Amino acid sequence: MNPERSEYIEIPVLPLRDVVIYPYMVIPLFVGRDKSIKCIEASMNKNKKIMLVTQKEAEIDEPTDNDLFTIGTTASILQMLKLPDGTVKVLVEGLQRAKVKKINNENGYFTAQIQLICTPEITEKEQSILIRTTLNQFENYVKFNKKISPEILNSLNNITNASQLSDMIAIHMPLKLSEKQSILETYNTNERLERLMAIMESEIDLLQVEKRIRNRVKKQMEKSQREYYLNEQMKAIQKELGEMDETLDEHEILKRKITTIKMPKEAQEKMASELHKLKMMSPMSAEATVVRSYIDWMIQIPWNIRSKVKKNLTQAQKILDSDHFGLDKVKERILEYLAVQSRINTVKGPILCLVGPPGVGKTSLGQSIARATGRKYIRMALGGIRDEAEIRGHRRTYIGSMPGKIIQKMAKVGVKNPLFLLDEIDKMSCDIRVDPASALLEVLDPEQNVAFNDHYLEVDYDLSNVMFIATSNSTNIPAPLLDRMEIIRISGYTEFEKLNIAKSYLKPKQIKRNALKSNELTIEDSVVTNIIRYYTREAGVRNLERELSKICRKCVKNLILNKSLKKIKITTDNLHDYLGIKKYDFGKTNYKNQIGQVIGLAWTEVGGELLTIEAACISGKGKLIYTGSLGEVMQESIQAALTVVRSQANKLGIKKNFYEKNDIHVHVPEGATPKDGPSAGIAMCTAIVSCLTGIPVKSDIAMTGEITLRGQILTIGGLKEKLLAAHRGGIKKVLIPYDNEKDLQEIPKTILKGLFVHPVKHIKEVLNLSLENTPYFSSK
């Protein structure tokens, strides 16, 4: 019997994606395509009947008749609702299977001529048997599949039509789209129910296997924690499928690695404990990841691996000389240090701390020492570190914990005796809550670092074989930390030293870096001297290197743009074409002789500096005003200087009561820069005397020294840096404390040759030498 009716019906067609509609099925549909919305509206305007056909490929947005299955379901639109976003929600009820004979696309939506499909009739007895058998099978299926509600079974028990029962069961079965369409295209009720029962039988078998796996896993879980359930279930599945590979146990590999590393006994016991703990854990657990990470760190750390240390001092001296010009005293101290270490075969001893302004070669000197000794070089920048955990590490109780920077660097370098450079040790941040400097005490103390304890490792690590060298711009370091280091000062370079450094190191380096050939660029020595004098004013050579780099870049540009240009020669005449106008004057000061203006000398982290000090006397009520971001010590120096002037007012020809009707204002320009220290005492006193007596101060004289209330001049620090600053600034005469005369032996002769340095004991000598006219008392 042919189930298809002979008559054709014209009806709108709605293409569906990823869903198959059966008869008796009530379902909401969301319609968004313009063509589909027109189809719904056309159906609503007629008899609310529509043909629902599924697309073969859901990804197609504009399907044709070839993209649709030929068998679908006629449906009745129960409800339609237009949504704010322009889409339409419709509630449809499947009515009857139908076959599409011809599709038209003339009115902006699909219509089709269809034939309704009638289900072949079966006897009442046969129908009763099929219903009972199918319901029993579905009930058995529901027992294993907990995702299907038992209430569905109750609703199916009331169905007396076998065809309707088959469609309702198909609705609730987790079938693929192709399987659902195949069941829709099965007209015969007997065949349809048989296919569904076969699918249910297959699903029941799979569910029974899954249940068997779960039961096996639960038995295995009795000896372990429930959190390992997922991993054990995976193992059981692999065992069921026969895909379990017999590979070398990971724990055995780790155990072999640990035995090959010669760890201290404490570390070996800790590793054995952690390995046993890892073995008892599931690899999928979070705790196992933490333990595995810990074991990996312990394996990476160099417990007994050393690099061979060179002990040839002659070779070490050659390396230091080839890498750095000058710095003779620094090199001598380093060679002494290396000589002692080579004899006692250990590095226990003072930790060297190279202190000097930026650009003088502190960091590169550390690299040279590493090369001279054959040690591997590792650098740790301490600038901005403000947490002790950066040094000691975090305890493993914290999520994402890691060893401190010390242990991390040791693991990276791979040997236990590298040269470890602690760069910018004075730039660490400290406050009342955190103090990383205290954590460094254990690292730098030779008596303690044999058992350095990182919070993450939880075992002691021997740092006694590491050669630590620190660098700093100043000695503003916590006293306990400073006490553990030997300070080696690296002062600024002289003009002669800068010239040689530029010729031997900086110029070849910049020519190579900017891809120039040696014969393409010539820079005369006089040009380098002019750059040092007129374009830089620094203790080191960093800005000098920048200016040379600027010349090289411009030369490369000119050579590329001008193909006929083969060589470039830089002379003093064309230097301004490359570097612009001169930034500084050399050999002359910037000031004329003025009343109340004195040039002092300061010593800062970046080297020596000229410090202009101004004083003015104005009508007032005896106030002392000081401005210019002055620190407490400098403010006290001003008060001491004023007291000296008041105590000797008669001798200076100043009225005794000058302070009653006058205010004295002392100012140090560049107010945004903080200034402090006692060494400007004599300069403050000279400026005050000058403004009160009206005698100008000589502009070619600079001075430095602390003053007492008796007018005595006390010693100061940083003499070499201050004299270098005076030389750079074109100062001819410098007044220094008498007790600092012995320090002149440390000053290069090239500097002393261009300066007249006059040691002074008392403020009388200072005033006689620095003022244009001799004060009243000096003639006595």
Curated annotation (Swiss-Prot):
Query: What induces or represses this gene?
Result: By heat shock.
Record domain Lon N-terminal: where: 11-204
- Oligomeric and partner information: Homohexamer. Organized in a ring with a central cavity.
Has UniProt tagged this entry with the keyword Nucleotide-binding?
Answer: yes
Read off the InterPro entries from this record: AAA+_ATPase, ATPase_AAA_core, Lon_bac, Lon_bac/euk-typ, Lon_lid, Lon_proteolytic, Lon_Prtase, Lon_prtase_N
Looking at the record's lineage, which domain of life comes first? Bacteria
What keywords are assigned to this protein?
ATP-binding, Cytoplasm, Hydrolase, Nucleotide-binding, Protease, Serine protease, Stress response
Q: What is this protein called?
A: Lon protease
Functional description taken from the UniProt entry: ATP-dependent serine protease that mediates the selective degradation of mutant and abnormal proteins as well as certain short-lived regulatory proteins. Required for cellular homeostasis and for survival from DNA damage and developmental changes induced by stress. Degrades polypeptides processively to yield small peptide fragments that are 5 to 10 amino acids long. Binds to DNA in a double-stranded, site-specific manner.
The entry marks the following residues as binding ATP, namely: G356, P357, P358, G359, V360, G361, K362, T363
Q: Which GO terms describe its cellular component?
A: cytoplasm
Q: Known catalysed reaction(s)?
A: Hydrolysis of proteins in presence of ATP
Could you give a single Gene Ontology term from the biological process aspect?
A: protein quality control for misfolded or incompletely synthesized proteins
Location in the cell: Cytoplasm
Would you identify the family this protein belongs to, as annotated?
Belongs to the peptidase S16 family.
Gene expressing this chain: lon
Question: Which EC class, in a word?
Answer: hydrolase
Q: What is its EC number?
A: 3.4.21.53
